[in-house]
Amino acid sequence: IHALNDSITLVHPEAFKLYISARSNILDDDGAVVFKGTWMRLMRRTVRDYLFRGTAAQETLAHWANIRRGEKLYISPFKDKANLQFDSSFAYEVPVLNNTATGLFNAMPSDTPRYSELQSILPAFERFEDVSPELLAKDSLLREFIGGGKYSY
């Protein structure tokens, strides 16, 4: 995660520096943002942490501000030094993760830290129809977050 940092790359000038992040916002036909890239990353992380790390959704949400702080301090300042920036967002990502993510978010107690922030995100999910994860290719990057892929982690 921190391999773009000068303290690492300056001693390895031959290294190819790659920055990967789900960065795209989803826009409506008028160009208005209907689902932010940061929400997509929160959704990915919440689903993955719940399914594969045994972490409750409210715990992921409670740590989200610290995760974002770490991104801003240790990753974002160096992303422009990458030889290649890759946006790992998928146009169909929200519909595939929608059912699992909204189930986790809706089950959170209202006294969860940052719950009010989550309430501003939940209506955005309603704009998307669910797409069955069964339709995803077994080698899809999204399988990292929902499982059922052909790779072992």
Question: Language-model segments: which ranges?
Answer:
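Conserved NTP phosphate-binding and transfer environment spanning the P-loop NTPase/kinase superfamily
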Residues: 1-153
